[in-house]
Amino acid sequence: MKTVIKNGTVYQNGRLIHADVLIEDQKIKVIGTNLTGDKEFDATGKLVAPGLVDVHVHYREPGQTYKEDIRTGSEAAARGGFTTVGAMPNVTPVPNTPELMEKMVKKNQEKGIVHIFQYGPITNDETTDIIPDYAALKKAGAFALSNDGHGVQTAQTMYLAMQKAKANNLIIATHAQDDSLFNHGIVNEGKKAEELNLPPVTELAETTQIARDLLLAQKTGVHYHICHVSTKTSVELVRMAKARGINVTCEVAPHHILLTDDDIPKDNGYYKMNPPLRNKEDQAALLVGLLDGTIDLIATDHAPHAKKEKQGGMKGAAFGITGSETAFSTLYTKFVKKDKVFTLEQLLSWLSDKPAEAFGLKDAGVLEPGKNADIAIFDIEHEATIEEKDYKSKGVNTPFTGQKVYGETVMTMVNGKVVYQRGTK
């Protein structure tokens, strides 16, 4: 059967064009005008984009399915326009053997409604210094390695991990955090931490580990990816490293460019995340880093929790906020439509082709004939309100609920199949 998406504004090869998209046999066949098919979707006034790519999500299965599971997490991704995601390995048990990795990959395929690529751990349970068999994990389906949620605390362990990752052509994606400097902190060091009388988080907890790892990456030649950079100094370190030819990429999370610690209204668990919200100077540096190419891509760090784990003050709350369902609309509304900091083409690139390119996901993030028909359609002309009742995720832990936005997802397709359509259950 031939399906045509008609009359849309199509993002292709870095440009926006007025075109139709013809889909057949799960693939994009033609992008052109005056196309016809057996089934047609009218996308007049809508944005037709490649399915977005999010290389940083937490789906909590197995082990904590009361927070999220593969099905609900992937449904949330689809509702946000994401068709390809990278799932972090901080589940129970951690997929640190080929048997566990194979089981995880199979579960992702059976339960997920989007393409789910699975990370393996850098170290066995993400906190020890024991390095698993990377070759076996890769053979079993691991596409990259991460201890996200934990920094690798010893330089020797990271050095060995990088050597082994390089030998197996695997990316090391790190949560840069020196625990001795993090020191059970909650809010970014500064006025807000003092005002709320909460333990501060120094930027050094992030930046010292990035500096260490960049030297190790230079020595080993590994592809070193930094998750959720959040400080001005982090951006400066990456900029210098790229100038020296170090094989480094990095991501920024939407909340770190949309919000600062000044936006925390009170001691509210919904604003507790790791890294924490930083100051305005850091926020400005992150935006400059995106615009000049120092920061390669945007990734949500979708981290769902049960309501009871985020209610009340920050001290007792879990770290993390959701992001899959709010990322595109909040970023588009603030930075493209209102403040005009980015172009729409730039935003789409950071959410589609750039992450796919960074992680070598060859079929993802582009609209081209012959590629998988992974497509997201957004309504960028009409305002909508982000409402808790609409979330597909089990987690509702986001400060963006109630915001009025443009860019709501109308439809998401994976391999030509509609996996989300606005207004349907």
From Swiss-Prot:
Binds 2 Zn(2+) ions per subunit. Its cofactor is Zn(2+). The active site is at D301. It catalyses: (S)-dihydroorotate + H2O = N-carbamoyl-L-aspartate + H(+). GO terms for molecular function: allantoinase activity; dihydroorotase activity; zinc ion binding. It is an enzyme of class 3 (hydrolase). Zn(2+) 1 binds at H56, H58, D148, D301. Pfam families: Amidohydro_1. Pathway: Pyrimidine metabolism; UMP biosynthesis via de novo pathway; (S)-dihydroorotate from bicarbonate: step 3/3. Belongs to the metallo-dependent hydrolases superfamily. DHOase family. Class I DHOase subfamily. This is Dihydroorotase. It comes from Lactobacillus acidophilus (strain ATCC 700396 / NCK56 / N2 / NCFM). The gene is pyrC.
